[in-house]
C-alpha cells in the first residue's frame, strides 16, 4: 500500500492518504514493536506499508527518506567509496560502482534494485532483492543471503 503520511499521524497510528485518494488510519504498533518502521513518520512524506490480514501494519517504509546518495567503502580494497543514488520515480544510478544501477522499487516490504553488471559476459538487467535492516537520516543497511551493505548518506 502506497501513499502520503498525513498530519494526523501519531505514535501508534499512521494516517495514510493513499495513492487512490483514500484516507486510512493504520495501526503501526506491531510494526513499531518489531522495529519494522523505517525512515520515520514525517507528514507529507511518501510511504510504503505492508499490511497484515487485520489491516494493521507489519512494515512501514518512508520512501522519501530513502532518496539520496548512499555510499560505502569499496569491499575490494576499502580505499574508495562506492554506492548508489536513489531518485524519485524509481530511478537509481551508480556512484563509482562496477554495476550500473537502473531502477529501484519497494515491493512487499523489500527493496528491488535493477542493474547491469559492467564488464561481465552477461549484459542483461538483473534484479536483486534486499531486506531493509535499518534506515535513518544518515544510514541505510540492506541485506540478502549473498550480500550486506551498510551505506552512509553522502550530502
Language-model features and meaning:
Residues 33-49:
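Short nucleic-acid-contacting surface segments enriched for D/E, G, S/T with interspersed K/R
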Residues 21-38:
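Beta-strand/loop nucleic-acid-binding surfaces
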Residues 1, 77-112, 116-123:
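N-terminal glycine/threonine-rich, aromatic-flanked beta-hairpin/loop signature
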Amino acid at each position: 500500500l502506497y501513499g502520503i503520511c498525513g498530519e494526523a499521524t501519531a505514535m501508534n497510528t499512521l494516517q495514510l492518504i493513499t495513492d487512490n485518494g483514500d484516507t486510512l488510519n493504520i495501526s503501526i504498533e506491531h510494526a513499531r514493536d518489531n522495529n519494522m518502521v523505517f525512515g520515520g513518520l514525517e507528514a507529507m512524506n511518501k510511504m510504503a506499508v505492508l499490511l497484515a490480514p487485520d489491516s494493521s501494519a507489519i512494515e512501514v517504509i518512508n520512501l522519501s527518506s530513502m532518496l539520496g546518495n548512499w555510499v560505502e567503502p569499496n569491499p575490494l580494497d576499502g580505499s574508495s567509496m562506492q554506492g548508489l543514488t536513489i531518485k524519485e520515480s524509481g530511478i537509481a544510478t551508480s556512484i563509482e560502482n562496477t554495476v550500473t544501477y537502473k531502477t529501484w522499487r519497494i515491493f512487499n516490504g523489500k527493496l528491488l534494485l535493477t542493474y547491469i553488471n559492467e564488464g561481465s559476459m552477461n549484459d542483461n538487467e538483473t534484479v536483486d532483492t534486499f531486506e531493509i535492516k535499518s534506515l535513518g537520516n544518515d544510514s541505510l543497511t540492506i541485506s540478502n543471503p549473498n550480500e550486506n551493505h551498510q551505506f552512509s548518506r553522502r550530502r
